[in-house]
Amino acid sequence: MDTFGLKIISSDRVFYEGRCRKMIVPVPDGGGMEILPHHEDMVIAVVIGEAMLQFEEGEWVNLAVGAGFLEIVNNRVTMLVQTAEKPEDIDARLAQEQMEYAEEKLRQKQSI
């Protein structure tokens, strides 16, 4: 089965670099965009959500991704996102603290 080159870069590291059969990324219209080998060259906005990757061996992996963009050129995909994590690597306590901090900041702005 055909594959494409994939490189996922988050703000703090290269998350993945290798071959991929298929990927589905969250896009602004609320859905997901599927990318297959030999996809037309383009740039796509990526929103916070779940991305799904099917590696060369056929294994599917789900990722939590932050906002960013994805570029497809000559059967190579580069995704630049704020964050990229496997669900099992997410620290639930830290995520809750960050959400509470963000909600407090929003409340402070609304009360001005």
Task: Identify the meaning behind each predicted range.
Residues 102-112:
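Helix-termini ("caps") and immediately adjacent flexible loops/tails
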